């Protein structure tokens, strides 16, 4: 058995061919939908990203009894249930909050995980703009990397 769970911030399903859109071409989503089960009666009760992810992974409504935060020790998450039944789970995410203090219990429930760096405030491969202390035309390094 293979299980793939896709979560996107700010992706409107009405812009996807599998949901009836005929003017935006999404061939990869169409092919994925042909081999997938769609949960089209699943609604998030909490729309901020971390609470919505907790709801989608556990089936528990988040904002009714708590605010933004990590998975709780009593949460039975979908990735953890699959993992405990010998189904390999892997998380690939650019959602930096999984790895920050206060949200760091989401990824531990998977067998393995990978963080795509560089989103939001993640300073990986980001340098503040540097200003040369002289006329830049006089610098030896002309490509702008100091």
Where are these regions (language model features)?
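Residue-level signal for pocket-adjacent positions within structured domains
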Residues: 11, 34, 38, 51-52, ...
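Short glycine/serine/threonine-biased micro-segments
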Residues: 18, 43, 57
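A short beta-strand-to-alpha-helix junction
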Residues: 22-25, 44, 69-76
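Short, surface-exposed acidic-centric catalytic microdomains
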Residues: 40-54
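Catalytic-site neighborhoods of secreted/periplasmic enzymes
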Residues: 53-146
């Amino acid at each position: 058995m293979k299980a793939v769970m896709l979560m996107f911030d700010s992706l409107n399903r009405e812009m996807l061919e599998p949901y009836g859109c005929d003017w935006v071409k999404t061939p990869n989503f169409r092919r994925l939908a042909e081999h997938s089960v769609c949960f089209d009666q699943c609604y998030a009760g909490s729309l901020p990203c971390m609470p919505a992810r907790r709801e989608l992974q556990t089936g528990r409504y988040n904002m009714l009894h708590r605010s933004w935060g990590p998975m709780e020790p009593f949460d039975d998450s979908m990735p953890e249930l699959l993992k405990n039944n010998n189904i390999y789970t892997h998380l690939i995410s650019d959602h930096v909050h999984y790895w920050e203090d206060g949200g760091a219990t989401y990824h531990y429930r998977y067998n393995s995980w990978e963080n795509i760096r560089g989103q939001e405030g993640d300073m990986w491969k980001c340098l503040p703009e540097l200003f040369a202390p002289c006329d830049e035309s006089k610098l030896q390094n002309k490509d702008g990397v100091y």
